[in-house]
């Protein structure tokens, strides 16, 4: 049923009151002035229905007279009149665009369903009560207030000192590293220790080649990488072994003679304790770590080995394991000043590990007979009280190993040549 606006219902009631039924009973039909009056209406009247009354709209209602007392001419005229009013009302509804406002369109979009969404609306609208908003606002305010009064002071009280200590620790390690490489840079020009560049490259690459050999043998795959790197390294194998033997003897000699106070620092001065605990030093030459470091404008290449202290106090749980139960007390470095690597590698340059291996091989090939100054540095692993010792002399061990040269003739024969 169509509901008419309030103003339209009032005007319809006034019209029906102005048209008396006396003139209709005389058979004259409508008043001659009725069409003019209807044309004068600004808005049309909705069509009448067969029910005796139109339902109420906003508290207003009106009622037509019974049509049984109206003549047939009047009924036909009334029917035409109501039909024209109905068409006019339809045009009015289209013009006014009832139930098609912007709010209605938004509501349709939010409530429309789609088969692609499981026959559910695209957007689900939640209604939040004002009580919930007030409660959430109060909770957030309470949390911020509690954080400000309790949590933040607690964080500053406990975690801020830890942050300061961590920053101090990082700076202290950086300072120790700078002091270490500063002493190395000072000692390199006046050292008496020498090493050929191919021997140094062999020290750097041999552990990598050895690991590749072990992996390829376990997996049953061709070790092309190791073969490619091992072409020139085989020639330096005996020289590398000779240098590692010298390194072991030289480190033990520095402890025996207490050079630079190294024995007193690591073992103390109690000879009775050495005998009682059966102190024994062991340098792990089978495992090393190759490193590149930049200090100021200089680049250092180094190979690092671990020095262990064995004693009765540190008995191994499993005797089959070589280094179990031994205490790692220091790192032994073999360091050279390396000019083969460009400085751009340390400034965010586009260099990879493959470039590192390539540079090592190219420098070995182009400088096969080049001799470089080197030093042996022993650095304790105690971070807070770290101390280092730099060895720059050959010692008795160097004099012994410097009396002969070792060269490999083929895969089976090795040649030892005494120097004059």
Swiss-Prot record:
It is found in: Mitochondrion; Mitochondrion membrane. One of its GO terms (cellular component) is mitochondrial inner membrane. Its main location: mitochondrion. The keyword Electron transport does not apply. Signal peptide: none annotated. It comes from the Eukaryota. The gene is MRX9. Component of MIOREX complexes, large expressome-like assemblies of ribosomes with factors involved in all the steps of post-transcriptional gene expression. Associates with the mitochondrial ribosome. It is a multi-pass membrane protein. Keywords: Membrane, Mitochondrion, Transmembrane, Transmembrane helix. The chain crosses the membrane at residues 125-145, 149-169. This is MIOREX complex component 9. Present with 450 molecules/cell in log phase SD medium.
């Amino acid at each position: 049923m169509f509901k008419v606006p309030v103003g339209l219902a009032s005007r319809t009631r006034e019209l029906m009151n102005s048209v008396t039924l006396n003139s209709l009973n005389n058979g004259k039909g409508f008043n001659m002035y009725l069409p003019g009056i209807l044309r004068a209406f600004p808005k049309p009247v909705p069509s009448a229905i067969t029910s005796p009354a139109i339902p109420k709209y906003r508290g207003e209602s009106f009622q037509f007279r019974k049509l049984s007392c109206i003549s047939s001419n009047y009924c036909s005229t009334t029917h035409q009149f109501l039909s024209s009013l109905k068409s006019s009302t339809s045009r009015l509804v289209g013009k006014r665009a009832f139930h098609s406002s912007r709010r209605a369109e938004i509501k349709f979009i939010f409530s429309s369903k789609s088969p692609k969404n499981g026959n559910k609306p695209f957007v689900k609208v939640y209604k939040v009560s004002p009580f919930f908003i007030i409660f959430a606002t109060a909770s957030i305010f309470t949390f911020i207030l509690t954080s400000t009064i309790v949590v933040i002071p607690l964080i500053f009280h406990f975690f801020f000192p830890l942050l300061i200590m961590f920053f101090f620790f990082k700076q202290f390690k950086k300072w120790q590293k700078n002091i270490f490489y500063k002493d190395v840079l000072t000692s390199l020009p006046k050292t008496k220790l020498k090493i050929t560049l191919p021997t140094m490259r062999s020290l750097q690459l041999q552990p990598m080649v050895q690991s590749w050999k072990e992996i390829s043998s376990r997996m049953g795959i061709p070790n092309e990488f190791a073969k490619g790197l091992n072409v020139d390294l085989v020639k330096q194998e005996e020289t590398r072994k000779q240098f590692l033997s010298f390194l072991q003897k030289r480190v033990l000699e520095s402890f025996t003679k207490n050079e630079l106070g190294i024995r007193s620092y690591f073992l103390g001065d109690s000879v009775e304790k050495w005998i009682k605990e059966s102190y024994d030093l062991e340098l792990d030459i089978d495992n090393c770590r190759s490193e590149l470091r930049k200090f100021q404008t200089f680049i250092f290449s180094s190979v690092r080995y671990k020095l262990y202290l064995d004693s009765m106090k540190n008995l191994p749980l499993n005797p089959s394991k070589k280094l179990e139960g031994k205490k790692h007390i220091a790192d032994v470095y073999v360091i050279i000043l390396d000019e083969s690597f460009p400085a751009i590698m340390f400034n965010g340059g586009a260099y990879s590990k493959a470039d590192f291996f390539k540079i090592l091989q190219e420098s070995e090939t182009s400088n096969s007979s080049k001799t470089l100054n080197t030093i042996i540095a022993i650095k304790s692993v105690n971070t807070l009280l770290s101390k280092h010792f730099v060895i720059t002399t050959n010692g008795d061990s160097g004099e012994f190993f410097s009396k002969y040269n070792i060269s490999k003739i083929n895969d089976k024969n090795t040649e030892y040549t005494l120097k004059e």
